[in-house]
Curated annotation (Swiss-Prot):
Topology in the lipid bilayer: Multi-pass membrane protein
GO biological process: cell migration; cell population proliferation; negative regulation of protein secretion; protein transport; regulation of epidermal growth factor receptor signaling pathway; regulation of proteasomal protein catabolic process
Coiled coil (UniProt feature): none
The name this protein goes by in its record: Inactive rhomboid protein 1
Organism: Callithrix jacchus (White-tufted-ear marmoset)
Keywords: Endoplasmic reticulum, Glycoprotein, Golgi apparatus, Growth factor binding, Membrane, Phosphoprotein, Protein transport, Transmembrane, Transmembrane helix, Transport
Disordered: annotated segments: 1-35
Pfam families in the record: iRhom1-2_N, Rhomboid
UniProt cross-references to Gene3D superfamilies, sorted A to Z: Rhomboid-like (1.20.1540.10)
Compositionally biased intervals (Low complexity): 25-35
SUPFAM superfamilies linked: Rhomboid-like
Lineage: Eukaryota, Metazoa, Chordata, Craniata, Vertebrata
Length: 855
């Protein structure tokens, strides 16, 4: 046995490089001077090699080190609610949540509002990578080294270069033990002394995979005949957050992944780069990948002896902290690059198509959105100041990007609803004026007449205003009992109360008209009680009537019997569904052929007894079953959607938010989609879908409510108020990051110019400036309450809490005031139409007065 051991030892000595010297110190008992509490710490730190693969080591504590778990008091419901509300509004006392909000805000600001102050840039940017030395890859002396470890040599760990501290110290009685991050191959103490390391520097967090990227990967897997799950298994290790401790997490979650190496074969290198681009080092640059693919195949060095000079030169080909850094051309000519290869145990086979997959990943990858410097900030060249406090800088770095779920859902709904509306209701005449159609139509008098139909043109390439009202547009007469519309309907019913059936002498037909409209020479106006056919009611002849094809004496359903006799007022008569006699009643108003029935025309509840041909030409709603206009409810027909609870009182208040998902046409929808995929999507990445959804919907509802007050007879659709509420978020974000911007006034005036331009654009027809103004004001209040912010000290933190409460109360007051003006004290503004549409011509703007819409 001893002979075999000597043979194996001699074979190992022959394979040992001549320059390699191993000095293994002998084990020595712990000295008396060494503190006893440091022994477990030292065993834990130096239990395994920090440069060679090792199995997961589980340290078993002695029985005297076992401690009872600390008993904690259960958090009360009140404290839980308070803590959750503080975290949601971004004013919690927890440093982690506060830094998370504020770092994301700074990152967003740097992309949107221009250049930052120089001090911010110096504290946000990492140190220069030009001065990288080999000493940064060497392991420093450990925190505590006993006599037995004083002879240990330094071990080179190339991947440890630039690895910053990811967690703070775990202090125990005044001494700290650093947590070594477990890399894909091994761990190294170089992680704690690199020239780029520091407790004050937190790593940039990786952006979550976009929906488009995941969809592209799934489609590629299906085209190749692979399962979608196979492609996602290799990415199960990737996280969208920084774990509290890399050592504890990797040891617990991935116990079988420590038997790997830093270096792999060329076929697996791209897989390693695509699997660990964010947790070990940044994604490789495109130029470096091209150099790697163009490099000639070299001899395989697997299992061979390693030369010291080659080992020291090979670190130049290894990934640095941010991507791959190429060696200078002069140095490359003197020292050829040598790839270091080593055997890797991999459960997955070699993957093909990596030369296409890596550029595709780089195509979909995007940097995080700095607070205050989003898309608009890039367009306006905003930058941070040169110097920013480190506390503010940490707040910027801690902010993560959210997935814009609300933006994608909203865009899908807008597109789908617009397509369905255009397909079902068609496209109105395109233009800015009014479109007139003239035709010869048979009317209720039995003769053809030339009639004209006037329709407002729609330059958005979409349905007409009547169709949009039927779909759910903002329209005050459908949301409340409008005083003018109600008085107009009552006046029409009063005229109908004194009408009677006009029977033509040639027996060509009859129609319900007034005495002025019935010819005394060509027809007979059957008016009760003058006409002998008048029935009796309670022993007296009826004073109002007659009605063509309706009489209480011959109607069976509903019958006019005591105590349910039909009233004296004919406008209160029900619709007769069944008559007891046919056309031979010996009553002239019952035996004639009726030529006109009620037709609801227009959008203001106007009813006219006319022929079906004329009703269809005027795009009205013809009622074949009724004989009087009082028997139909035209506003219910015009508004559509759900029927009113009381047919006389419109109550479709849900139009305030339903109209946010409608558009006036295809162009209108495209404009909204462009806005949502740029500004709204950018802001949702910063604040999350729940905050943006609240601001978007409440701003739109407030804008529509103000528009319904000042422009009650105008059908409006689209998220105009919501979009201006989102624009108000940009102003609030600018105000919150004012102290860190290099030129905040320039960014402010640029934003102001954009808003003024959009407000001027709102002077065109079909664009509501009242919704713009109210949506912007409400969005301003809501943004101060719900958007994330950057705090500049404890006093500023308390000020933000007061600010949240104050602006929520102000918004609720604004909303309550608008509700009172709409339902309780309605107002009428004569000049308000000039604020939303300037009549350059007589027919440029649609008339807002009630009488102008009556045909």
């Amino acid at each position: 046995m001893s002979e075999a051991r000597r043979d194996s030892t001699s074979s190992l000595q022959r394979k040992k490089p001549p320059w390699l010297k191993l000095d293994i110190p002998s084990a020595a008992p712990a000295t008396a001077e060494e503190p006893s509490f440091l022994q477990p710490l030292r065993r834990q730190v130096f239990l395994r090699s920090v440069s060679m693969p090792a199995e997961t080591a589980h340290i078993s504590s002695p029985h005297y080190e076992l401690r009872r778990p600390v008993l904690q008091r259960q958090t009360s419901i009140t404290q839980t609610i308070r803590r959750g509300a503080a975290d949601w509004f971004g004013v919690s006392k927890e440093s982690d949540s506060t830094q998370k909000w504020q770092r994301k805000s700074i990152r967003h600001c740097s992309q949107r509002y221009g250049k930052l102050k120089p001090q911010v840039l110096r504290e946000l940017d990492l140190p220069s990578q030009d001065n990288v030395s080999l000493t940064s890859t060497e392991t420093p002396p450990p925190l505590y080294v006993g006599p037995c470890q004083l002879g240990m040599q330094k071990i080179i760990d190339p991947l440890a270069r630039g690895r910053a501290f990811r967690v703070a110290d775990d202090t125990a009685e005044g001494l700290s033990a650093p947590h070594t991050p477990v890399t894909p191959g091994a761990a190294s103490l170089c992680s704690f002394s690199s020239s780029r390391s520091g407790f004050h520097r937190l790593p940039r967090r990786r952006k979550r995979e976009s929906v488009a990227k995941m969809s592209f990967r799934a489609a590629a897997a299906l085209m190749k005949g692979r399962s979608v799950r196979d492609g996602t298994l290799r990415r199960a290790q990737r996280r969208s957050f920084t774990p509290a401790s890399f050592l504890e997490e990797d040891t617990t979650d991935f116990p079988d992944e420590l038997d790997t190496s830093f270096f792999a074969r060329e076929g697996i290198l791209h897989e390693e780069l695509s699997t660990y681009p964010d947790e070990v080092f940044e994604s490789p640059s495109e130029a470096a990948l091209k150099d790697w693919e163009k490099a000639p195949e070299q001899a395989d060095l697997t299992g061979g002896a390693l030369d010291r000079s080659e080992l020291e030169r090979s670190h130049l080909m290894l990934p640095l902290e941010r991507g791959w850094r190429k060696q200078k051309e002069g140095a490359a000519a003197q020292q050829p690059k040598v790839r270091l290869r080593q055997e890797v145990v991999s459960t997955a086979g070699p993957r093909r198509g990596q030369r296409i997959a890596v550029p595709v990943r780089k195509l979909f990858a995007r940097e995080k959105r700095p607070y205050g410097l989003g898309m608009v900030g890039r367009l306006t060249n905003r930058t941070y100041r040169k110097r920013i406090d480190s506390f503010v800088k940490r707040q910027i770095e801690d902010m993560d990007d959210h997935r814009p779920f609300f933006t994608y859902w909203l865009t899908f709904v807008h597109s789908l609803v617009t397509i369905l509306a255009v397909c079902i209701y068609g496209i109105a005449p395109v233009g800015f004026s009014q479109h007139e159609t003239v035709d010869s139509v048979l009317r209720n008098r039995g003769v053809y007449e030339n009639v004209k139909y006037v329709q407002q043109e729609n330059f958005w390439i979409g349905p007409s205003s009547e169709a949009l009202i039927h779909l759910g547009a903002k329209f005050s007469p459908c949301m409340r009992q409008d005083p003018q519309v109600h008085s107009f309907i009552r006046a029409a019913r009063e005229r109908e109360k004194h009408s009677a059936c006009c029977v033509r002498n040639d027996r060509s037909g009859c129609v319900q008209t007034s005495e002025e409209e019935c010819s005394s020479t060509l027809a007979v106006w059957v008016k009760w009680p003058v006409h002998p056919s008048a029935p009796e009611l309670a022993g007296h002849k009826r004073q109002f009537g007659s009605v063509c094809h309706q009489d209480p004496r011959v109607c069976d359903e509903p019958s006019s019997e005591d105590p349910h006799e039909w009233p004296e007022d004919i406008t209160r008569w029900p619709i007769c569904t069944k008559n007891s006699a046919g056309n031979h009643t010996n009553h002239p108003h019952m035996d004639c052929v009726i030529t006109g029935r009620p037709c609801c025309i227009g959008t203001k509840g106007r009813c006219e007894i006319t022929s079906r041909e004329y009703c269809d030409f005027m795009r009205g709603y013809f009622h074949e079953e009724a004989t009087l206009c009082s028997q139909v409810h035209c506003m219910d027909d015009v508004c559509g959607l759900l029927p009113f609870l009381n047919p006389e009182v419109p109550d479709q208040f849900y139009r305030l938010w339903l109209s946010l998902f409608l558009h006036a046409g295809i162009l209108h929808c495209l404009v909204s989609i462009c806005f949502q995929m740029t500004v709204l999507r950018d802001l949702e990445k910063l604040a999350g879908w729940h905050r943006i959804a609240i601001i978007y919907l409440l701003s739109g509802v407030t804008g529509n409510l103000a528009s319904a007050i000042f422009l009650p007879y105008r059908a409006e659709v689209g998220p105009a108020g919501s979009q201006f509420g989102i624009l108000a978020c940009l102003f609030v974000e600018l105000f919150q990051s004012w102290q860190i911007l290099a030129r905040p006034w320039r960014a402010f005036f640029k934003l102001l110019a954009v808003v003024l331009f959009l407000f001027t654009f709102g002077l065109l027809p079909w664009i509501d400036n009242f919704a713009h103004i109210s949506g912007f004001i409400s969005g301003l209040f809501l943004s101060f309450a719900f958007l994330p912010y950057i705090s500049f000290g404890k006093f500023d933190l308390y000020r933000k809490r007061c600010q949240i409460i104050v602006f929520q109360v102000v918004f609720l007051g604004l909303l309550a005031g608008l509700v009172v003006l709409f339902y309780v004290y309605p107002v009428r503004c004569e000049w308000c139409e000039f604020l939303t549409c300037i009549p350059f011509t007589d027919k440029f703007c649609e008339k807002y007065e009630l009488d102008a819409q009556l045909h």
